Amino acid sequence: MAAAVLGFAASTAPALPWQPADDAAVLEHVPARSELERLAPLRAALMAHPQDLQVALALSSGYIDIGRRNSDPRFIAYAQATLLPWVSRASPPERALVLQAIALQYLHRFGAALTLLDRAIALVPLDGQAWLTRASLLELRGDYPDARRACARLMLRADEFAALTCLASVDGRSGRLTESYSALRNSGGDPRLPAPLRAWRLGALADMAERLGDDRMAEAYLKAALHASRDDPYLRAAYADLLLRLGRPVEVVALLKDSEAQDPLLLRLAIAGRRSGNAQAGRWSQLYDERLRAAARDGDSSHQREQAMYLLEVRDDPRAALEVAARNWSVQREPADLRVYARAAARANSPHDLAAIARWCAATHYEDHLLSLPPAARVAERPL
């Protein structure tokens, strides 16, 4: 979410090179040349004027964008390295703190990200991006009361669209699912809004529709969201998960066949290939397994949800999947995290974990049609 990271790597002895089982395996993804070339003028400008904050912010934002769209944490590290001279100051600029927090969020360092956001808000109390990022982090961790308070602060900026979408998303996970879904649907989507904002609203509607048991509308909203932001890896993963659950793996292969470079999407390809009998299924599974081992070697534990899914759906190892899913649940609590945890607990026959899930749902008033299925149906259900 890294000059510090890069500096640490440079100051230690290099590890022995790790060789994949398949010499043809692609372990790293190099983003399209056009993406990197787009940032070349900013890199040159920052080298010429290292004290230019606006250039540093633009370059770090570009790195974060590339890293997010390509699921490539190296570019998040580049963003952190670009921001480090600014956030290390005794009085760091507020915008640098917010961007560094966004980078930390990507790396799942949520506590550190919240600390930076609190510092940024202390400097600029009405910064909408800081409050929205804070709300997103708190919602992701399942801290719905504090997330709602952060959403409400957006109203002070007269940012009605962001506030409404933010509040609907949080309220929809804390006891007001039907009302929040209706309110967000009736709010309409202004076509003049930037595509990422339209996609955010549509993605939130898709999540609510699925938890209400309306798969038809969930799919329609996801398709519309992808139309607004077709390269968003999170939306593509969500749509793939829906198609897998509905027993349509061939469509997942068609959707993601050119997405091997992005680990979360490669996982969905491996699952879909296995289900559909695709000739590439074994290669996709092996490639994902090698990516997992490479991530473990590098100390990267930011995709534990996907690791649990892999252990459950490809390796058919519910006990190992449950261990990873429970560890992931202690860090982040999105609907997809809960479903993977619940499915692993059911498959591993763990009453303790199922009871813990039930207690959390009761305490937060969380609603999900898929989780209301009886245990036997949960076990038989396709990936969450």
Question: Which residue stretches match the model-derived regions?
Answer:
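Residue at a conserved register position within TPR or TPR-like alpha-solenoid repeats
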Residues: 63, 70, 104, 138, ...
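Canonical positions in the second alpha-helix
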Residues: 45, 85-86, 119-120, 153-154, ...
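Residue-level detector of the short coil/turn that links helix A to helix B
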Residues: 74, 108, 142, 175, ...
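Canonical tetratricopeptide repeat
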Residues: 58, 99, 133, 166-167, ...
